[in-house]
Amino acid sequence: MTRTFVVGLDGASWRLLDPWIEDGTLPNLAALREESSWAQTRSCLPPVTFPNWKCYSSGKDPGDFGVYWFERVDLDAETIEVMNGGDFDTVELWDYLNDEGQSAGVINMPTMYPPREVEDVVVAGGPDAVEGEYRSIDSGYTHPSGLDDELADRFDYRVHPEPLLSGNDERGEEVDAILDLLEKRFEVAVTLAEERDLEYVHVTLFYLNVLHHFFWDEEPSKRAWQLVDEWVGKLDDMDDTNLVLMSDHGSAPTTTEFYVNEWLAEQGYQARERTVEDVLRPLGLDRENLLRVAKTAGVVDLLAETIPERIQQLIPQREGAKRARKLEAVDLDRTQAVASGQGPIYLNDDFDVESVRESLMADLRQVEDDEGKLFTGVYKGEEVYDGPYADEAPEIVVDMRPGVHVNDGIGGGEITTAPDRWAAENTPQGIFLASGPDFEARGQLKQMSILDMAPTLLVAHDCDVPTDMHGEVLPIFDDDRTWDSREPISLGGTGAAEDSEEVAERLQQLGYME
């Protein structure tokens, strides 16, 4: 059977790539697009790593597996819990490949930590495979266990780069460390594919989107994409191999930062409590300043290992309180709504939820800056999500205008600002490209859903499509290709849950949960 090699390009968009394709910067990608079927994709809302990598691999929307962003907000229980791979209640396309006797390898795809038992191999990656806010994980991130030692010995493999990129003024060794990491992802994926004779291989370049966030189309991102282009050429030359390029979402240059919880407070939907941030912030004591000093002194690892996490969490972030500390800053008895970043908004059912929702949605539709409305859509949760976990969905979901970054920090004081740390923000418009023996070269297709990828890739491997997958099989096969529906299979064990605090800290350092 022809092998399929899927390259997951976190945050890739044709908006970023088209100029480089046209000016000759990415010659292999340009040539590949001429001989393939390709499309712009539409991600599930919100267009973020969590949940969209699982949307790709499961063919389902978040209402089917119960994760809507990096955190789960439960105002009844007064908790905010950070998600990891064990929280996604779903089987994935490689489970169906295994069920049909085909082997698969998944390298560095977010949402896969703790590593699941997939036949043949899983190498979990960023951002969820972590040991602490400023420390990479050294072991326990592979299936089978022990493979992590082999990768370290043979490839000097790392899950996260060191030093970690944390700002757009860091263009030296932090960027070089990411480029080295991307190179090793490809080396490991190709080696495992060949040595283990894998029939399906998926490798994700998560830190590619970290470069997008901090630099957009500047030189660090361009260097990374030139590296990707070189590997695209190598993979395209492999015999009997389908090559698929895809992304979990797209990206666009940031124009506006919108502090949604600050806006909710201003509009009367949220009431506040005084916190330690209110004392330390006026003194200039924030996490960004202290990290900069620690990096300069070369003591980041020492401080991360010696200062207890609970003490680290007391140091405020410049943008305001995040994660569970958001609820410490909120008087829930007088609060009607609390937001996560990048789209989800949760309502307090101690109030009249439908009345609050109607009023809040109307107000959100009117929010604007100098460039117009901030949101292209404001939806009820049930309009966006379906499935057994839809009752846990946020009551409201906003779709951000390209370039708008919705920040969930509480207590920073500002509502709408110019971009701060991030030069680019996520958008729902990602990429898909399929080339190789099993695919017809149909050129540009109409916009497709990210949910279409899993059923299409199963059909490429002569597998039937489970009835609980929402996507459609793309018209990129010859007329002789046939398939049927099949019953879904049940989910096996997914491993022990990782400490959600550690996951949150890594996301926070990268700017995902600022």
Spans of model-derived segments:
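Active-site neighborhoods of enzymes that stabilize oxyanions during catalysis
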Residues: 97, 288-444, 448-454
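Active-site-proximal N-terminal segment of extracellular/periplasmic enzymes that hydrolyze or transfer
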Residues: 1-37, 469, 506, 513
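Short catalytic/ligand-binding loop motif for oxyanion handling, primarily in non-cytosolic enzymes
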Residues: 14-16, 49-50, 64-65, 112-119, ...
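His/Asp/Glu-rich, glycine-adjacent segments
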Residues: 61-215, 285-318, 332-372
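Short, structured active-site-proximal loop/turn typified by the sulfatase FGly-forming signature C/S-X-P-X-R
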Residues: 18-60, 105
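Acidic/histidine-rich catalytic neighborhood
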Residues: 233, 237-243, 249-349, 480-488
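Long, internal low-complexity/basic segments
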Residues: 381, 387-393, 411, 447, ...
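Metal-dependent active-site segment of extracytoplasmic phospho-/sulfohydrolases and closely related
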Residues: 28, 216, 225-265, 269-270, ...
